[in-house]
A protein has these predicted regions:
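Two-component/phosphorelay signaling modules centered on CheY-like receiver
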Residues: 14-33
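Helix N-cap/capping motif at the beta->alpha junctions
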Residues: 34-43, 64
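Short amphipathic alpha-helix used as the core "switch/output" element in two-component signaling
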Residues: 43, 65-78
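Receiver (REC) domain active-site loop signature in two-component systems and cognate sites
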Residues: 59
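C-terminal output helix
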Residues: 110-120
Length: 128
């Protein structure tokens, strides 16, 4: 699968950003940028065009839930699918992500197949 969609990967750990970026690239999604927290992500989202956000939940300054809320209340950004990626597998986090408008949720560690499947499913639901 190859597509020209642009991804923003948000995680406070550079190693995790690099892993997600490489997994996306291996899945045919080669256009990606990175941000270290929700504040940096919002700045990039408001100043560049992105098609998909993959974000960690637990980050300093602005966590993934706060970032999701900011994206969903912004008229120019609310259409963006947001995939929450976290080490937390708590039911309340999964429910909060869904209620907040996240397009999906996966738990670390995950495989390339899991990430690719979730991204592809979200894109199909969006008609992309």
């Amino acid at each position: 699968m190859t597509t020209a969609l642009r991804f923003l990967i948000v995680d406070d750990f550079s190693t995790m950003r690099r892993i997600v970026r490489n997994l996306l690239k291996e899945s045919g999604f080669s256009d990606a940028d990175e941000a270290e927290d929700g504040v940096a992500a919002l700045n990039k989202l408001r100043n560049s065009k992105f098609d998909f956000v993959v974000t960690d939940i637990n980050m300093p300054n602005m966590n993934g839930f706060q970032l999701l809320a900011e994206i969903k209340k912004d008229e120019k950004l609310k259409h963006l699918p947001v995939l929450m990626v976290t080490a937390e597998a708590r039911k309340e986090d999964i429910v909060a992500a869904a209620q907040g408008g996240a397009a999906g949720y996966i738990v670390k560690p995950f495989t390339k197949a899991t990430l690719e499947e979730k991204v592809t499913l979200i894109l199909k639901k969006m008609g992309l």
